[in-house]
A protein has these predicted regions:
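Short catalytic micro-motifs in class I SAM-dependent methyltransferases
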Residues: 8-15, 20
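S-adenosyl-L-methionine-dependent methyltransferase catalytic module, highlighting the catalytic core
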Residues: 17-143
Length: 145
């Protein structure tokens, strides 16, 4: 149970509440704790979550709320497709450090072994403009002490 080298979770953490609900009993802190337990010492947790600061900046710059709405509230295309929490680098780093992670850092999705997988770690605005757009995902790695 404690031997994983890497856990990768792309746009998962924001779907867990701060406090448990009957229909969503796990909190994001419990999820992070579970992932921490599953990693071996020196193992890496690689997260991608909506970058709340980037979404706010894009909205303030463009006044186009429709383009950033899903980053705040989730896509809402099906049950449970909504967000309970938003993250900045500073808030995520603080939580990861308090849970026993170290060396918290932003990673470049282009440098990962899964760069060819078109997932939300590559979410840009304007939509999928990876050359001129702004990355809307906060991509963070942390190492288990």
């Amino acid at each position: 149970y404690t031997n994983a080298d890497l856990i990768y979770a792309c746009h998962v953490l924001e779907h867990f509440p701060t406090k448990p609900f009957p229909f969503q009993p796990l909190t994001w802190k419990e999820v992070l704790t579970s992932w921490h337990k599953a990693l071996r010492p020196g193992g890496v947790l690689r997260l991608s979550v909506p970058d709340i600061k980037a979404a706010c900046e894009h909205y303030l710059l463009t006044d186009d709320f429709d383009s950033v709405q899903a980053f705040f509230y989730g896509g809402q295309k099906y049950d449970f497709d909504y967000h309970y929490h938003g993250w900045s680098y500073e808030t995520l780093e603080k939580e990861l450090m308090s849970m026993g992670f170290c060396d918290v850092r932003v990673y470049d999705w282009k440098s990962t072994e899964h760069f060819y997988v078109d997932d939300y770690s590559q979410a840009y605005l304007p939509h999928m403009d990876k050359t001129n757009g702004k990355l809307m995902s906060l991509n963070v790695e942390a190492t288990k002490k």
